């Protein structure tokens, strides 16, 4: 059997797809492009309406380009709207998230899907050719109730992988040659709460900080209230942990944060990122913001842009508000017009570009540890800057690079 996996969305979905691919390969299936595969698995996202649309377009394109293929759809869109997905061309099966990990076995043994409790999951088998970094999912599900978010309905309750399983996967990844591992989860900050053995996110990060092999761990997105002083201190002190944080802000006005049901204030967020910057002057600190949330007035939008300009952030992901039926925000009045949302998104993206420019400028002339990627002619630094280097070396090697060039066009050269 020839298979192809098409993935949309977050790092958790990417990790899920890698696990599916690894199990399919282990069961004798062969990877192929979507237009040549017997079976195409589409792993969908549903965080926004445009994510749903992108999945539908991809499925229709697969049906057009490979009319003989069987299309299996999984992920958050498939979980949220199974009948809608099942009606798309060539879709032979819709697999909800809590049965995703049985998919490879079903395909290769023709077993019927049984009931499942959606445990956090099967062990991965790392080793995808051409990759230097692995995304390792250690947690899934979310029990927060952000008023705009559909994900708790599609991913279910929070479930953590036990620490022995996580360490076993890391050992396998190191043996397979990976030198960077991104640790991810749907609500990573809740890691361990369901294990009932005292394990916490800090327990996990402390284990990573003391890992004996020369591997870099990159902690994926953390909610601000979960990024404790202890976690920040561990990252600052350990060579094993990348100086890289992603901390979703969502808005700068406490009134909007309360409407979004985000459990922190703008002042709390500012103190957090300023503490990180004080401890790690070269750290990458990314964030997410939502513009056009119901009830957002022009004054709120202006305050957001002003607040962002005062923060030591390095890059932004800007999300125009997307109405998700079934969420509290969907029932809110005072919706912002589409034209206003687009203008506000443009203003915030401009602020984000300025943050990135300032960060790039601060890094010119510095020497950073980096991993060679692609064919060895590119590097990714520990603080998440990707740039070409003047001469190629072997892929997947640790090097030191001196950063040159200009903001938006950084260039590295090997430092002695």
Residue spans of the language-model regions?
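Proteins enriched for Cys/Gly/acidic motifs involved in redox and nucleic-acid/cofactor modification
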Residues: 1-191, 206, 230, 245, ...
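Active-site proximal loops enriched in glycine and acidic residues that flank catalytic Cys/His/Asp
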Residues: 7, 185, 221, 249, ...
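Residue-level signal for inorganic ion chemistry
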Residues: 41, 76, 103, 183, ...
């Amino acid at each position: 059997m020839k298979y192809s996996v098409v993935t949309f969305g977050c790092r958790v979905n990417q990790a899920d797809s890698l696990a599916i691919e690894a199990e399919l390969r282990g069961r004798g299936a062969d990877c192929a492009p979507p237009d040549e595969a017997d079976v195409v698995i589409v792993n969908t996202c549903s965080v926004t309406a445009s994510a749903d649309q992108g999945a539908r377009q991809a499925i229709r394109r697969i049906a057009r380009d490979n009319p003989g293929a069987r299309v299996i759809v999984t992920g958050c869109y498939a979980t949220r709207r199974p009948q809608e997905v099942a009606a798309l061309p060539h879709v032979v099966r819709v697999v909800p998230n809590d049965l995703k990990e049985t998919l490879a076995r079903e395909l290769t043994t023709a077993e019927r899907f049984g009931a499942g409790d959606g445990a956090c999951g099967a062990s991965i088998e790392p080793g995808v050719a051409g990759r230097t970094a692995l995304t390792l999912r250690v947690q899934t599900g979310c029990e927060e109730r952000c008023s705009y978010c559909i994900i708790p309905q599609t991913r279910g309750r929070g479930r953590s992988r036990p620490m022995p399983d996580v360490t076993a996967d890391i050992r396998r990844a190191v043996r397979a040659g990976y030198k960077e591992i991104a640790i991810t989860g749907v609500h990573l900050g809740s890691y361990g709460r369901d294990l009932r053995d005292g394990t916490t996110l800090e327990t996990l990060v402390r284990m990573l900080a003391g890992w004996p092999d020369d591997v870099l761990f990159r902690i994926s997105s953390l909610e601000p209230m979960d990024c404790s002083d202890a976690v920040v201190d561990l990252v600052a002190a350990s060579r094993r942990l990348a100086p890289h944080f992603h901390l979703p802000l969502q808005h700068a006005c406490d009134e909007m944060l309360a409407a979004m049901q985000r459990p922190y204030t703008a002042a709390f967020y500012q103190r957090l990122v300023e503490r990180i910057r004080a401890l790690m002057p070269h750290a990458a600190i990314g964030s997410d913001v939502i513009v056009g949330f119901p009830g957002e007035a022009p004054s709120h939008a202006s305050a957001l842009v002003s607040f962002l300009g005062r923060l030591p952030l390095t890059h932004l992901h800007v999300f125009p508000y997307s109405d998700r039926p079934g969420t509290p925000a969907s029932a809110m009045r005072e919706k912002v017009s589409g034209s206003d949302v687009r203008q506000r998104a443009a203003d915030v993206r401009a602020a984000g570009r300025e943050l990135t420019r300032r960060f790039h400028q601060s890094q010119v002339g510095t020497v950073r540890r980096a991993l060679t990627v692609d064919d060895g002619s590119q590097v990714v630094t520990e603080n998440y800057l990707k740039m070409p280097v003047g001469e190629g070396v072997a892929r997947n090697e640790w090097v030191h690079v001196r950063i040159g060039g200009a903001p938006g066009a950084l260039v590295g050269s090997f430092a002695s």
